[in-house]
């Protein structure tokens, strides 16, 4: 079974980008609260 590298990269970005964005917002919020 051949893995489609572009599909894998697209899926990884689709998951990682929003996760990183939310993580940055969370860190900023915690920093401001402290």
UniProtKB/Swiss-Prot annotation:
It is found in: Plastid, Chloroplast thylakoid membrane. Keywords: Chloroplast, Membrane, Photosynthesis, Photosystem II, Plastid, Reaction center, Thylakoid, Transmembrane, Transmembrane helix. InterPro entries: PSII_PsbM (IPR007826), PSII_PsbM_sf (IPR037269). SUPFAM superfamilies: Photosystem II reaction center protein M, PsbM. One of its GO terms (cellular component) is chloroplast thylakoid membrane. It comes from the Eukaryota. Belongs to the PsbM family. PSII is composed of 1 copy each of membrane proteins PsbA, PsbB, PsbC, PsbD, PsbE, PsbF, PsbH, PsbI, PsbJ, PsbK, PsbL, PsbM, PsbT, PsbX, PsbY, PsbZ, Psb30/Ycf12, at least 3 peripheral proteins of the oxygen-evolving complex and a large number of cofactors. It forms dimeric complexes. One of the components of the core complex of photosystem II (PSII). PSII is a light-driven water:plastoquinone oxidoreductase that uses light energy to abstract electrons from H(2)O, generating O(2) and a proton gradient subsequently used for ATP formation. It consists of a core antenna complex that captures photons, and an electron transfer chain that converts photonic excitation into a charge separation. This subunit is found at the monomer-monomer interface. This is Photosystem II reaction center protein M. The lineage of its organism: Eukaryota, Viridiplantae, Streptophyta, Embryophyta, Tracheophyta. The gene is psbM.
